[in-house]
Swiss-Prot record:
Compartmental location: Nucleus
Listed PANTHER family: PROTEIN LOL1, PROTEIN LSD1
UniProt-listed InterPro entries: LSD1-like, Znf_LSD1
Top-level lineage group: Eukaryota
The protein, known as: Protein LOL1
Region (Putative zinc finger 3): 111-141
Organism (species): Arabidopsis thaliana (Mouse-ear cress)
GO molecular function annotations of the record: DNA binding
Additional information: Over-expression of LOL1 induces cell death.
Length: 154
C-alpha cells in the first residue's frame, strides 16, 4: 500500500530588506550615504558619519571619503567596470584589472559623431581628430575645415 507523501515544508519567509528610494544626486538618503566596495564593486549603503564600511559580501573594508567630498564616475577602459573616484583626480587605477584610466573633468572633454558610423565619440578638448573604436574611422574636429577624414588600415 502506497504511503502518502507530505509536501515539503514551506521555508520561513525571509526578512525583507528595507526598501530604499533612489538616492538624491548627493548620494544620501535620510541619514545614509553610498559608496562602491573596494573589493567586489557592490554598492554599499552606510550611515552618515561612518569612517569605514565592511562589505557583507566580500568582507573588504572600504574607507569613507571625508564629508563634502565630491565624487565622480568613469567606466574602466580595460574591463568596463564602473569606477568612483574623488572629483579632481587626474587618473584612476581600476581595482579589478589594474588599468590606469585618465580622468578628465567635464569641461575638458567634447563630443562628436563618427563621420562613418555616427557613433557618439568623446575626445579631449583641443584635439584635432578622434579615432572611432568601432570602425577605426578618424573624424576631424576643431576649427580647421581643410583636413579630411580618413580610415586607418589596421
Amino acid at each position: 500500500m502506497p504511503v502518502p507523501l507530505a509536501p515539503y515544508p514551506t521555508p520561513p519567509a525571509p526578512a525583507l530588506a528595507p526598501s530604499y528610494n533612489t538616492p538624491p544626486a548627493n548620494g544620501s538618503t535620510s541619514g545614509q550615504s553610498q559608496l562602491v566596495c573596494s573589493g567586489c564593486r557592490n554598492l554599499l549603503m552606510y550611515p552618515v558619519g561612518a569612517t569605514s564600511v565592511c562589505c557583507a559580501v566580500c568582507n573588504a573594508v572600504t574607507a569613507v571619503p571625508p564629508p563634502g567630498t565630491e565624487m565622480a564616475q568613469l567606466v574602466c577602459g580595460g574591463c568596463h567596470t564602473l569606477l568612483m573616484y574623488i572629483r579632481g583626480a587626474t587618473s584612476v587605477q581600476c581595482s579589478c584589472c589594474h588599468t590606469v584610466n585618465l580622468a578628465l573633468e567635464a569641461n575638458q572633454v567634447a563630443h562628436v559623431n563618427c563621420g562613418n558610423c555616427m557613433m557618439l565619440l568623446m575626445y579631449q578638448y583641443g584635439a584635432r581628430s578622434v579615432k572611432c573604436a568601432v570602425c577605426n574611422f578618424v573624424t576631424s574636429v576643431g576649427g580647421s575645415t581643410s583636413t579630411t577624414d580618413s580610415k586607418f588600415n589596421n
